[in-house]
Amino acid sequence: DPDGTSRRRFVERVRRSRTTIGALLMDQKVVAGIGNIYRAELLFRARLDPFVPGRDLTAGMCEEMWEDLVALMTYGARTGRIVTTQPEHRAIEARIVERSRGTRQNGDEDPDVVPREESFYVYHRQTLPCRLCGTTVRSGEIAARTVFWCPRCQSARSRRADWTRQHPAAPWALAEAPAR
């Protein structure tokens, strides 16, 4: 999207809708290509409650979410894996156990591959503690799909009025990744 048309269309469609942002991200008319993993992780990284109506978001929130989505999907396309966590947010103990078993996300044997259990902040982590605050991750349903979120990190109180909070994985997601 070199001319920014898709970004502008995304921002416009989200901001004029009463539908929840969690449902809008799964609507192919709003944005194509986002599956359940990217939806859950994108909303967590943006500290957005999945049940907030799109019209309650600012243009800045939508634009930053778009930028993060592009970075995550670019990384995923380059590496062939979906990884949304920063290295410092992964549990060392889980990496040791996972490596001893020898299984990796997508069956990859590369020792530098992030184990699936360490790849996500909230996706499929319901009943487990949030990697950032320790609150139990919850799950519910939006748009006939299960959605995962941290009730503390993704509450209205977790966002600031000017929304200047940096995404937890922004510097890492934009780092050069090895090609597959």
PLM region spans:
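Basic, nucleic-acid-binding surfaces and adjacent catalytic neighborhoods in DNA/RNA-processing proteins
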Residues: 10-180
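An acidic intrinsically disordered interaction segment
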Residues: 5-9
